[in-house]
Amino acid sequence: MSPDNWNDSSLAATLLVMTSTAPATATPEDILRGAGLRVTAPRVAALHAVGESQHATADDVLSSVRAELGTVSVQAVYDVLHALTDAGLLRRIEPAGHPARYERRTGDNHHHVVCRACGTIGDVDCTVGHAPCLTPSDDHGFVVETAEVTYWGLCLDCRT
């Protein structure tokens, strides 16, 4: 599906609401312990911030963590985001021309749609086959684990 062919119903049908692979009843503390990480206030606050913002920038997380905890350094937030990403609790995405974003939806191989006008990002489920959704014509001996696809277009708000 190319952005030129998007319409309200096809776009709405492919966008997903952000979900985490952790059970709905799991607390941030449970999630951290389950990943073998120490439970710290900045880590808990960062998980909460990313969960609330879906595709949060580091600045979004910093603002939220500071609102919750008070003084926290920029470096501390970047360290937390790095640790949570390395542990597989967050996924870092980097749409071209946009700051890195963090999301809690991990463990699957979904893709993203980005509005060229306002930068809104939505999740798009893997549309064909099993992960990684795309089969390269030549894998050069690699074992392909994921494929990253970014759809670009205009969201409903920016089209009106």
Can you annotate each of these PLM segments?
Residues 1-23:
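Short, intrinsically disordered or compositionally biased N-terminal tails of bacterial proteins
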Residues 56-65:
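Short acidic, hydrophobic short linear motifs in intrinsically disordered regions
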Residues 77-87:
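Basic amphipathic alpha-helical segments that dock to polyanions
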